[in-house]
Amino acid sequence: MIELILVIVILGILAAIAVPKFAATRTDAQISKGRSDISALRSAIVSERQSRLIKGDHDFINRLDNDVDANTEDVTIFDSNESLSATSPKLLMYGLKTKDAAGHWLKTDDNEYTYKFGSASVTFTYYPSDTTDDNDDFHPAGSFDCDHTDENCKKLTQ
């Protein structure tokens, strides 16, 4: 009987230690997924730009999706843009489905996308042309970036 109580106590202690570790691991996995998505997107933007330069087009693509409505779930983003025809190459071969949940992207405005991880979220903006924002921060054409003063942005980009 004492052995059974001892086993239950040990399992309780292990559970109290392990549960917070597993919760942190899930958020870390979502951050890693976000970093991977961001790297793939940035690489695809540059690759598409190089393809356009070879063809004599000096402009960056104008959007990262097929004019998807903001805050709409279960639609594909980052797969194409309105200037591409059905036979043209896509931005990402396999776009990402939107969802308003941790570990997922959601389009929140024209050329603005939010990535959620854990209880945090970070908004990224795509700049198809050179832009200076309201804070006098300069964003070069083709950049896909967030506010680097935000700690959550730093977790995804640094």
Task: List PLM regions with ranges.
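N-terminal single-pass transmembrane signal-anchor helix
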Residues: 1-27
